[in-house]
Amino acid sequence: MNIVGIIAEYNPFHLGHARQIAETRRALGDCAVVCAMSGHWVQRGECALTDKWTRAGMALRGGADLVLELPTPWATSSAESFARGGVGILVAAGVVDTLSFGSEGGDTAPLYRAAACLGSEEYRTALRRFLDKGLPFAACRQAAVEELLGREAALCLSRPNDNLAVEYLRALPERMGALA
């Protein structure tokens, strides 16, 4: 049986979240769903709409089997740290073998290409060149990936859910699968 992890804020839990859980179960068959969910504080540094216990209850009623808390330092951080913290919690649980996440474009190929690029020396060199021009980091990051891989792969960095998906892919250990 697969045990799937989902990293989320569920602020609040809605039908799209329930659909993700249902689609994950449909794609993988018999599986358990473990969620790493932010606590009282969410990624933008805001207080969640409802307390973490209420949101965890909504997730359980919406199809999750277990909800773990993503500690505040990771929950309120950048996409990279949010992803690393969430994947870290799921890996530490010792049972999750697949990560399920949403993407805006639906095509995972550019996400994988961007994730691989962000770990390369060529990327770091291109990024430094753009940063030296005094541009904001996010713009430099996207420009460096566009220079190396083209517009399609770089565009995913401008879409919040795809950007987070790229960071999930970067944080995944090799033994863990991904389902977008």
Which stretches of residues belong to each language-model region?
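Non-catalytic positions within long, well-ordered alpha-helices that form the structural scaffold/packing
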Residues: 25-26, 60, 87, 91-92
